[in-house]
UniProtKB/Swiss-Prot annotation:
The keyword Oxidoreductase applies. Keywords: Flavoprotein, FMN, NAD, Oxidoreductase. This is FMN-dependent NADH:quinone oxidoreductase. It comes from Bradyrhizobium sp. (strain BTAi1 / ATCC BAA-1182). FMN binds at S9, M93, Y94, N95, F96. Belongs to the azoreductase type 1 family. Quinone reductase that provides resistance to thiol-specific stress caused by electrophilic quinones. Also exhibits azoreductase activity. Catalyzes the reductive cleavage of the azo bond in aromatic azo compounds to the corresponding amines. It is an enzyme of class 1 (oxidoreductase). The keyword Flavoprotein applies. Gene3D superfamilies: 3.40.50.360. SUPFAM superfamilies: Flavoproteins. Homodimer.
Length: 201
């Protein structure tokens, strides 16, 4: 089976989401050696944001070399996603949402006829059967029931987007409060890794 591993944190070595996404992938591979892993670091190799030229080229308009290269990058991203059985995404919360690098990747996936279609009764997701696991880190506490829950446009957005594509199995391995001191940070990471181990079992 194929596993797509995505990282989007700009924090590098100190990134909690990178630590957690790597842990999730390691646990999955430990449980099943047959995984074929494709890795994309959206910070080391960022995708450009959508342009009018890119959209026009997808519809058959003439394109210069730069736009053709951009289209090729988008098609490669789409192929990786469509081929994957499981997608593990390192997605920190930045300013209540997701990193712009991750948003650029997501924008390459929302393509009518590829990942969703419009039917008689509205949009229909075409990616049923896939599984998404999100390694989520937040400096504060934003989970349901917290005073800041209404500001969560990170996990809620990802849940909505992948659900729109027809993916029903979406899990979050969450470390919250990682900016609230070393003790809270350590406990949050340990709890997230414990949850990851249960998901991979």
């Amino acid at each position: 089976m194929k596993l797509l591993h995505i990282d989007s944190s700009i924090a590098g070595v100190g990134s909690v989401t990178r630590e957690l996404s790597a842990e999730i992938v390691a646990l999955l591979k430990g449980a099943d050696k047959s995984w074929n892993v494709i890795y994309r670091d959206l910070v080391a190799e960022p995708l450009s944001h959508l342009t009018g030229g890119y959209l026009a080229a997808l519809q058959g308009a003439p394109a210069d070399q730069a736009v053709q290269a951009d289209v090729g990058a988008g098609l490669a991203v789409m192929e990786d996603f469509l081929a994957a059985d499981v997608i593990v995404i390192g997605a920190p919360m930045y300013n209540f949402g997701v990193p712009s690098q991750l948003k650029a990747w997501i924008d390459r996936l929302a393509v009518p006829g590829k990942t969703f279609s419009y039917g008689e009764h509205g949009p229909v997701g075409l990616c049923k059967g896939k599984k998404v696991i999100v390694a989520s880190a937040r400096g504060g506490i934003f989970s349901a029931g917290s005073p800041l829950a209404a500001l969560d446009h990170q996990e809620n957005y990802l849940l909505s987007f992948f659900g729109f594509l027809g993916i029903a199995e979406i899990s979050f391995v969450r470390a919250e409060g990682v900016a609230l001191g070393p003790v809270v940070r350590a406990k949050a990471i340990a709890a997230a890794k414990e949850h990851a181990a249960k998901l991979a079992a």
